[in-house]
Amino acid sequence: RACIRKYWALPRRDSIMHETGLRILIRKIQLVAAQYDKALTPVFSYSKEHYMRVFLRNDKGKNKADEILKLHGMLNGAGPMWLGKLWDINIIDKICKNSLKSRIFSKNNELMKFLKTIKEESKINAVGFYDLNGICEKNKIKKLQKKETIKNKIRKLGYKASDTHFKSEGVSSDIPLNKLIKLLKNK
């Protein structure tokens, strides 16, 4: 009820709820900005533990604001939400390069792994990700292959694949679900 009241959107408690929540938050911010003819585009977004952070670029103009609103929609019964990109690849590259140069940040292995994951994830043009354990359970696939093996098989089929920062068992990919299930069933 709080999500409907505060963000004018319907949430879902499922494996991608953190990404869904982030996208609902972005949409709400964009709606408020659009009232003032401002178009806000995410350049860096993440959900970690119980926190969500969104950094946005502000472009002025009613036409630009209208274009942003066209990228709102539903996903798996949740939303409406932002269905555009969560990251600007150029900004992610700069953040990663600057972090590597920094004596403080470069020694923080957890931070560097987190940034690397987001950098890879930002290259995939997909909304949502695949929860491998959930897919295997739902489709009665008894043995799950290693995640790295699955990602390599997806890439061999010509699709993109990376880890997702939203969930450790998740894979972000542009592969259709039916092809992923077939891949998981074939060992």
Question: What would you call each of these model-derived segments?
Answer:
Residues 1-187:
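SAM-dependent transferase fold signal centered on methyltransferase-like domains
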